[in-house]
Amino acid sequence: MNQKTLKIMEYERIKQALRGYLVSAAGQHELAELAPTADAKQLQIWLDESRDGADIYRLENGIPLPKLDDIRPHLHRLAMEAALNGLELAQISRVLWTTSSVVKFFRDLTEKEITLRRLDRVVKELVTLPDVTRRLRTSLEGDGHITDEASPALRQIRQHIAQTEVAIRQTMDQYTRGKDAKYLSETIVTIRDERYVIPVRAEYKQRFGGIVHDQSASGQTLFIEPQAVVGLNNRLRQNQIDERHEEQRILAELTALLDPYQAEILRNSEILGHFDFINAKAKYAHQLKATEPKLSEDNQVNLRQARHPLIDPKKVVANDITIGRDYKTIIVTGPNTGGKTITLKTLALVQLMGQSGLFIPANENSVIGIFDDIFADIGDEQSIEQSLSTFSGHMENIVAILRQADERSLIVVDELGAGTDPQEGAALAIAILDQMGTLGSYVMASTHYPELKAYGYNRPETINASMEFDGETLQPTYHLLIGIPGRSNALDIAARLGMPEQVVAAARGLTDQDSQDLNAMISDLTEQKRHADADAERLRQELAEADELHAQLKKQFDAYQHQKDQLMTDAKREANRLVDESRKRANQIISDLRKKQLAAGKSVVKEDELIAAQGALNALQQDSKLKKNRVLRREKAKLDFHKGDSVLVKSYGQVGVLMEQLDDQHWEVQLGILKMKIATNDLEKAQDPAKSAKQPRASVKRSGSSGMSATLDLRGHRYEEAMAEVDRYIDSALLAGYPSVTIIHGKGTGALRKGVTDYLKRNNRIKSFGFSPANAGGDGSTVVHFK
C-alpha cells in the first residue's frame, strides 16, 4: 500500500490508538507489522477474527491475558545453551501458565455454546505443557525469586540460614541492650562485608575482641564482629554459599527442562500475542462504535453514516459515501471550509482500516472495496527545502499517481487544479479526471471550480456532489450531498453580515444570470433532498421498530407454543402414569376373578365383559409425544369410514365391522358376538378379511373369516397345557362370534376327553356340547354350542 497515503491519512494514529490496549510484547510486534492488504482471502480471515474478538469482548469482556514480556531473547539464549536466570524463567513460566488458562477459557466458551468463526481453530495450535508449567510455577515467584518449594535441599539450607540469623541477633542483642551498650556509638546491628557487626567507639575496641571490618569516616567508630559471633557468621556465610549453589543448580535444571520445547513455547507466545492484538481490535471497535464491514471484490463501496475515526465523536459528522456501483468518480464542488477535505479523508481512512482487518466507524451493513492501492493528494505536502510551490508540488503528486494507478486503485484528490490561473486550472482538472477515468480508477476529488459542475453531468460513471450549507444560519452542516453540485453562498453571507443592500444588489447584477439561476436550482434541490433524507430516515426507523417488534412477538409466540406443548406432554405423562397404575390393579382383579371362577366352577362375570373392560382401560393410554399425536390426528381425519368396512379397533387389538355411525366421534362396531360403541380415533381401516393372508399355527388352523379356526386340535398336548389352551380358545371363539366350535381331543386314555367335558360342564357360557357324529370323529372330538 502507498506509504505516502498512510502518512497523509494519519494511519499511524490508528495504530497508536490500538497500542494503548495491548498487554503483551508479542502483540506489540504484530501491531508494528499491521498494514492494509489487497488479498481478499487474508482480509476475510482478519475480519472473521475481529468478529470473534468483538463477540468475546461483548459476552466475556475479552480473552483473559496478563502482561506478557518479550521472551524471544530468552529463547535465543536457551538455543545458545546458556542457563536462564530466575526472571527470564518466570517470564516464560507466565507464558506457559497463560497458555493453559486461554485453552480452558475457549473450552468454556464451547460448553456455553458460543459460536466462533475462526478463533476456536486458532486456539488448537496452542501446546500446553502441564508438567513443565507446574514445575516452573512451584519453583519461581513472579519476580524470578526461587521459592523454598524448588527443592528439599534449598528449603533445608534456608531453614539453617534463618536459625543462624536468629542466633546471631540474639547474641548481638546482648551487646546492644546489655551493660556493654554504653561502649557503642549506636545501639544497632549492621552488616559489613556480608557479616553482622556492631558500631564500637574506637577507644573501646579491645573490650569486645573479634574482627574489625570497617571504620567511620572520622575514625571514631569501628565496625567490629565480636569474637562471640565469629563462628556463627562463618556458619551463616557457608549456608549462604550453599544456598547460591543450590539456586544455580535449580536454575540449570529448569533451563534444561525447557530445552526440548523451544519451538512450542515461541509459538505459544506468538499466538497469545495474536489474541492480545484481537482483544485490542475489539476494544478499539467498541470505543469507536465500529461495525464489521462487508467486502466487495467488485469495489462497490457503500459506507453508511461513516465517521472520521480521529475526530472527537461528539463533534464528528457522519456521512453516507457510495462509489463503484452507479458511478466511479465523485466531483465534490463548492466553496472551502465546508468539510470537503474531511469527507475525502474519511473515505480513504475508513477504507484503509477495513483493509487492515479492523472494524470501521460506520453503521451496520457498510461495504468496503478491496483496492490494490489507495492514492491521495491532500494539502500542501511539499518540503520547504525543495522550495516547491503549492501548484508544483500538487502536480508532482498527480503525475506520480497517474503513473501508478490502475482499475483497482482508489484516488482521493483535494482541490484538484488549485494554485494556478482558474481557467487553466479548471481545464487541467478536467483533463486529469479524464485520464483517471481512462485508467479505470475510482476517484473522489474536490474542487471549487464551477466548470467542473457540468463535467459531472456530461461524463459517464461520474456524479456531482457538494457539502450542505444551511441558508438560515449561513453555516456549513458538513453533510455530503451526492447528486447535487455545490453553489456559491458569498452574496448571501455578505448580506447576512450587514453588507449594504445596494452593494449586494450591484454584485448580483454583475453576476451572470445563468449562474444565479443555477444557484437557485441547486438551493431548491438541496432543500428537496433534505426533506427526502428526513423521510427516508423516519421510514428506516419505523421499519427497524417493526422488525424488532416482529422479532419480539415471534419469540413470545415460540415460548408460548413450547410452554403449551410442555404442559400437554406433562399432563399426558401424568395421565399415563395413572392409567398404568389402574391397569395393573384391574389386571390383578381380573386375574383373581378368573382364579375364583375356575375354582368355583362357574363364572360370576362374563369373560367377554372382562375383555371389554380391559380394552376400554387400554384405550385411556395417551401417546406422550405430542407432535406424533398431531400427525396421527391429521392422518385419521383423512380416513373415510363407511358402514360395512372392516376396521381394526386399536385399543382391543381386534378386527370388527362398522355397523352404524352413532355421531361425529363414535361408531357402533360388531366384534364377534359383541356390538360396541367405539371412538372414531380408535379405528383404523383393516385389510379385507377375504384378502388377508393365512397364518397357520402348529395345532390351530386360522380361518379366513374371523382370524381364528373353528376347530381346536389338542392331540399331542399334555393335560395341563391342553386345559389352558381350551380356556383361551373358548374366550377367543366367543369374542369372534362363533355359534359353535369343535374340540379334537382324541380317544387315547380318555383323560383329555374327560378334562374337556368337565370344563364345559362348569362354563355357564356353553349352551350344549356332545361328541361329533361317527363319520366326523365320534367320541374323539366334541362339538360345543354357545349361548
UniProtKB/Swiss-Prot annotation:
- The residues that hold ATP are G334, P335, N336, T337, G338, G339, K340, T341
Top-rank taxon of the source lineage equals Bacteria
Q: Does the keyword Transport apply?
A: no
Q: What is its EC number?
A: 3.1.-.-, 3.6.4.-
Kindly give the Pfam families that the UniProt entry links to this protein: MSSS (PF20297), MutS_V (PF00488), Smr (PF01713)
Q: What keywords were assigned to this record? A: ATP-binding, DNA-binding, Endonuclease, Hydrolase, Nuclease, Nucleotide-binding, RNA-binding, rRNA-binding
Cite the InterPro entries for this sequence. Answer: DNA_mismatch_repair_MutS_C, DNA_mismatch_repair_MutS_core, DNA_mismatch_repair_MutS_sf, MSSS, MutS, MutS2, P-loop_NTPase, Smr_dom
Quick check: keyword Lipoprotein in the entry? no
| PROSITE patterns given in the database record | DNA_MISMATCH_REPAIR_2 (PS00486), SMR (PS50828)
Q: State the SMART domains in the record.
A: MUTSac, MUTSd, SMR
Give the EC class as a word. Answer: hydrolase
Gene Ontology MF: a single term: ATP binding
What CDD domains does the record point to? ABC_MutS2
Q: Quick one: where's region Disordered? A: 685-709
Purpose: Endonuclease that is involved in the suppression of homologous recombination and thus may have a key role in the control of bacterial genetic diversity. Acts as a ribosome collision sensor, splitting the ribosome into its 2 subunits. Detects stalled/collided 70S ribosomes which it binds and splits by an ATP-hydrolysis driven conformational change. Acts upstream of the ribosome quality control system (RQC), a ribosome-associated complex that mediates the extraction of incompletely synthesized nascent chains from stalled ribosomes and their subsequent degradation. Probably generates substrates for RQC.
Of which family is this protein a member?
A: Belongs to the DNA mismatch repair MutS family. MutS2 subfamily.
Assembly mode: Homodimer. Binds to stalled ribosomes, contacting rRNA.
UniProt name for this protein = Endonuclease MutS2
In which organism is this protein found?
Levilactobacillus brevis (strain ATCC 367 / BCRC 12310 / CIP 105137 / JCM 1170 / LMG 11437 / NCIMB 947 / NCTC 947) (Lactobacillus brevis)
